[in-house]
Structures are given as C-alpha cells and as structure tokens.
Amino acid sequence: MIILKKQHDTIIVLDFGSQYNQLIARRIREFGVYSELHPHTITAEEIKAMNPKGIIFSGGPNSVYGEGALHCDEKIFDLGLPIFGICYGMQLMTQQFGGTVERANHREYGKAVLKVENESKLYANLPEEQVVWMSHGDLVTGLPEGFVVDATSESCPIAGMSNEAKNLYGVQFHPEVRHSEHGNDLIKNFVFGVCGCSEGWNMENFIEVELEKIRETVGDKKVLCALSGGVDSSVVAVLIHKAIGDQLTCIFVDHGLLRKGEAEGVMKTFSEGFHMNVIKVDAKERFMNKLKGVEDPEQKRKIIGNEFIYVFDDEASKLEGMDFLAQGTLYTDIVESGTATAQTIKSHHNVGGLPEDMQFKLIEPLNTLFKDEVRVLGSELGIPDEIVWRQPFPGPGLGIRVLGEITEEKLEIVRESDAILREEITKAGLDREIWQYFTALPGMRSVGVMGDERTYDYTVGIRAVTSIDGMTADWARIPWDVLEKISVRIVNEVKHVNRIVYDVTSKPPATIEWE
C-alpha cells in the first residue's frame, strides 16, 4: 500500500475478511481523505506510527465466538482513536468490552429498514428511517457497559450502538455498500464529524507518489508491460512510460480471444499514437491448442494466465535485461480472488494462475485503485476518452464469455454479437450510463423458426450492469426498443443464433462475468 505524505489525514481500515472491505477505503477516498487497508494482525504500535485520525473494523465471514475467530491487538483500543466497527467489527468490539454476541435464528441477507433511536454523531442529519444492506448470521444481543442502542431493524434489535465518551461506534449493516441509502453520509459523519478529517487527497497525489515509487522500484532496469488495449493495461502502460520512458517495452499478445477490430486498434493507438515500443505476438494457435477440450472456467482462466506468462517469458528471452512484468491488477481483482482472511469467490486472471517459476518480478501500480479511479487517473495522464471509457475487458478475453469449450465458431458468434451490442448502445447514447455491457454464449441451443424453416441454433446472452467500482452492480434498465434493435440485428446478422436473452441479475448474488 502506498504511504503518502503525512500532511494528508488518513483513516485505517482493518481487514477481517469481508468481501466489501476495499469498498470502505474506496468510499473514504471519494471524500478526499486517504484510506489504507491493513490486515487485522497489525499491531497498535504500527498503527500509532502511521498517525491516523481513526480506525474502521471491516466485516467478515467468521463468528467472534467460533473456532478460528479473527481478533486484533487489544492495545488498539488504548490508542484513544475513534473506532467504527462494521458487522463483524461491531461484534468484535462488543466482545472486547464485555457485551454478548449470539447466533441469529436465521441469516439476514439483503435490504432492511433501519430505525434510528439515538442521534449519535454517526447519524447526524440523517433520516430516522432508512434502507440499509444486511449480511450477517450473528447478532449483538447484549450491549457492553457504557454503550447505547443507536438504531434497530425488524430482525436486529441492536443494529447500531455507540459509546460517544470513548468515540466507539458500531453498526450491524454495511454502509459501504451502495444498497444502503445513506451509507456514504454515515461514513462521512464518522470521517469528518467524529474523526475531524480534512480533505486533501486526490489523483494528482497518487500520480506523484506512484511515479516516484515506480522509478525507485525499477531503477535503471527494464519493464515488460502486458498490454491488451483495455482501460487497465493502457493506464498502466502510460503511467509507467511517463515514469521511465524507453525502459518500458509493451508486449501485445493476440491470443485470438479479443473483440472485433481490437488487435489493429491497439497497435495504432500505442505504437503510433503514444510512440511506445510495442511488440505484437500472434499466439492464436498456441492458445487455442491449449484450450482445446477444456470446459471448466477455472481451468480456462489458469491456462490463459499461464500461457500469457509463458509467452512473455519467451519474448523476454529474446530481449536483454527485462526484470519486471507490469500488470493492470485492481483492488477488485484482489478481493474477488480472496485475501488472507476473505473467502475466495473465483481466481482472477491478474492474480491467479501464475506459474511458480515465473522469471519476472511483478509491478502492479493500480492494485490500490478501483475501476472508476483508474478512469480518473487515465484522464489525468492525458489518455483519450475513447480509451479511458473503453468497456472493461477481462484478461482471458472472450475465453470466459464462451461458456464451456472454446471453438472458433463460438468465438466468432460472441465477437460479432458483442460488436453489434456495443454499436447500438453507443447509438442510443447509453455508453457512458452503463458501466459494463457484453454478450456471452452459454452453449445452449434452442428450437426456432427462420424463413419458414426449423432451426436449432445458439442462444446469446446479453449482460449489462450499472456500477461505480465493480464491487456491487445492478442490471441496467436498457429501453425495450434498444434491446429489440440489438436482438433483431444479432439474430439476422450473426450466423447460428436464433434466440437472445437478457441477464437481469445483480451483483451480488451473481458476478458480472458469467465465468
């Protein structure tokens, strides 16, 4: 994690394993206050040395009374800093100060109506009733001495508590998740009202620190960048090029799993436009041979991840003095792959599947940023809007949008249908409103009628979501007439397709990608 100059107020977030923990730091950064995420094992002395204005305990999947329960250094409570416990964090605080935590009769997951009973600083200027996001299996059933109930819900009699004399606060819900109506306001109240923070952190600070960090890390050595043309790798390439210039060599691997026209566009933009040293590797046949007969999504991800590294290894052996490999790993990549305390959802192409004998040191300058921050960073670096606002695209490419075994025919269906979707979304003026949209091929066939003849062809799925950072997402309400145009065009213009379906599932419970 980047350590910024000490004139910037900082809030420390302790990680107890919640899949939402990075969101807490992200929300605080949105307010112009720097926030760092640290493991729950950090010591009180280490925190004291950082001179933070306050501490937040994240949620987590464990029970405070269960085997393997996660705890923190008890001396943290003696630092005199404001502490805000969220979900598991509140339960841990309760246990620490002698309260009672018990298993709930049933797990509560989803939206709930919160009723504010005591207007502590945390609830200042907030409505008495508000919708919040619950995700817990345990409850605080007995308050610690000196604490009062701040809020309740139908299934949670102690949904919020505080000891304002000691600046200790806890909530059973997740204010960092956007489903909580006034979650941002509540976190703001803690950051500014309780901790007394001032704004002072922005992307200019990040660029200044990261450029210095890259130069210090790399020195006079050389860096290979895995350039795909997507937002993440593009920003990484430009940022590193700004830091070290010609010490950077970009390798663009055409693995045959790219979107329509993407390979040509990448070379034109970066080789000609940004005057970078870009080596194009045609590895279509190599990847397809490795993926032949493979259906399991995790295995596909691992194969694609491994093959990328092997390709870079091959190319690096042709070059002299290549020591570092740059990747566009984001915060969301790391959280979805699981941390030391989080439960793994799925391996990610930027953090999973790397061979143990990899010959490069990794450099990941974006691994503290969320997608929306990367776009801001890209704009600050002077990258054109058409790149900064390009659709998010996973490292495995269309390989995880073809469910099951990958074939050239299936890739062509996804490639052509996706191009139509992107074209129509742009025509409708929705390309900036919808966070991510793409087509996927679930591998199922269905009966249809075309030209008075029976068909038995593929179904194409359309996925479109609205989001801020990719941690949570809602399905996009695309107008029916736009969906109709997309459907008609795909069925008529893409061979072997006779049916279109639209995915109306949010994240959670689903992930954005289908594999």
From Swiss-Prot:
GO molecular function, one term: ATP binding
Major enzyme class: ligase
Protein name (record): GMP synthase [glutamine-hydrolyzing]
Native source organism of the sequence: Bacillus thuringiensis subsp. konkukian (strain 97-27)
Glutamine amidotransferase type-1 domain ranges (all copies): 10-200
Domain GMPS ATP-PPase: 201-390
One Gene Ontology cellular component annotation held by this UniProt entry: cytosol
CDD domains the record matches: GATase1_GMP_Synthase, GMP_synthase_C
Gene3D superfamilies cross-referenced by the UniProt entry: 3.30.300.10, 3.40.50.880, HUPs (3.40.50.620)
PANTHER family associated with the record: GMP SYNTHASE [GLUTAMINE-HYDROLYZING] (PTHR11922:SF2), GMP SYNTHASE-RELATED (PTHR11922)
Pathway named in the protein's UniProt entry: Purine metabolism; GMP biosynthesis; GMP from XMP (L-Gln route): step 1/1
Functional note: Catalyzes the synthesis of GMP from XMP.
Catalysis performed (reactions): XMP + L-glutamine + ATP + H2O = GMP + L-glutamate + AMP + diphosphate + 2 H(+)
Keyword Cytoplasm recorded: no
Taxon lineage: Bacteria, Bacillati, Bacillota, Bacilli, Bacillales
Entries under SUPFAM superfamilies matching the protein: Adenine nucleotide alpha hydrolases-like (SSF52402), Class I glutamine amidotransferase-like (SSF52317), GMP synthetase C-terminal dimerisation domain (SSF54810)
